[in-house]
Amino acid sequence: MTSSKTGQITIRSIGAGGDGVANLPDGQIYVPFTLPGEVVNVARDKNRATLMALLEASPERQNPACRHFEDCGGCALQHWQDEPYRLWKRELVVGALKGRGTDVEVAPLVACNPHTRRRAVFAARKTEKGVLLGFNRHQSHEIIDIVECPVTVPEIIARLDDLREVGALLAPGSGPFKLAATLTESGLDLAASGCGKLNDEQRRALTALVIKKDFARLSHEGEIIVEPKKPLIHFGKVPVPIPPGCFLQATAEAEETMAALVLAHLGKARRVADLFCGVGTFALRIAEKSAVHAVENDAAALAALDRGVRHVQGLKPVSIERRDLFRRPLMTKELLPYNAVVFDPPRAGAEEQALELAKSKVEKVVAISCNPVTLARDLAILQKGGYRIERVTPIDQFLWSAHVEAVAVLTKGRQ
């Protein structure tokens, strides 16, 4: 098959992005929504192809959970049965580690349930027929207007029509914008972006609608428009008033799994540094037993963590520091007071911090990541510095996607 033709091919594997991969004489091509062993007709465009017809289906194929699957670009793998899907997702972590020469124990994938994603970032646009609200088509800016989503919590999906009403008031003409909805203990927290400058009339109308529909808050580009209720989320026993758009783990159940792994490894550590701590997802749980130094570059997240600490008694001391750990990692000397370090960086990982940590005498480390490639790089640095990787646990926090969370626990100086 040439680089811009239609033809028949056989899918050999699933790539790291969740697409089927076929090996052709002139290279690999990637075909979304296919499975290993399937024979398909495709329309090829260079190294990508569109599925035109399924000629021979895999016995591992199943009916997708959502009517929007293959139109909506939010999910890649609803059509794959659970067992092979989970083995493949675990292998993303195993393969990344082996690519760095790291052969360690990788636990079975921890499964997560459907209907548990507590934040949805919707693409939206106002049309003559109303507001489109949903997710972009696969590799496109076209918005697929949704009526269901088996990934997201029902409390958000039940409010789609109400969200469209809010979107109608926010819309910047006919241009696209984003509207995120986060489930908190106080109700739905709405955060809009890309709506341009809101005028006074819009603000008054939005305020009235948010109150009428019993949303907890509406913000735009980080500015709070109206906040009838403080959006709260508990981390351990500490209720934290989360700032607009702050980072949260995608599902509460995955967060609990990660926290349990962190706490089990830290054990009786007296002083812990929690790096890239966010709003205190792990720091506030750790503080129930250990003194914690929480480091984060997001001032609003740190302020929220601090407010949470001030309203709860019985915690060990919690100190906070605003710091860009990419530019200014904690140096080896600064790590001397700590028995343990936890770090949960963005997808780029924590290479500079890992280089300093590798030279330290910190006894226990927990590395958390949503990117197996950068996690493997950082773990290889720590391993070279004398750390022993005890175990890596992959967690399917991003159901039916090509993304996977992982928690690695490491020790130094103890056999």
UniProtKB/Swiss-Prot annotation:
Q: Which GO terms describe its biological process?
A: rRNA base methylation
Q: Tell me which residues bind S-adenosyl-L-methionine.
A: Q249, F276, E296, D344
The family database entries (InterPro entries) matched by this protein are listed as: MeTrfase_TrmA_AS (IPR030390), NA-bd_OB-fold (IPR012340), SAM-dependent_MTases_sf (IPR029063), U5_MeTrfase_fam (IPR010280)
**EC code:** 2.1.1.-
User: Record keywords: Nuclease included?
Assistant: no
A GO term for molecular function = 4 iron, 4 sulfur cluster binding
Instruction: Please list the residues that bind [4Fe-4S] cluster.
Output: C66, C72, C75, C149
Quick check: keyword S-adenosyl-L-methionine in the entry? yes
Q: Which residues form the active site?
A: C370
Q: List the Gene3D superfamilies.
A: 2.40.50.1070, Nucleic acid-binding proteins, Vaccinia Virus protein VP39
Highest taxon of the lineage: Bacteria
Q: Which UniProt keywords apply?
A: 4Fe-4S, Iron, Iron-sulfur, Metal-binding, Methyltransferase, S-adenosyl-L-methionine, Transferase
UniProt lists the family membership as follows: Belongs to the class I-like SAM-binding methyltransferase superfamily. RNA M5U methyltransferase family.
What is the designated name of this protein? Uncharacterized RNA methyltransferase BMEI1496
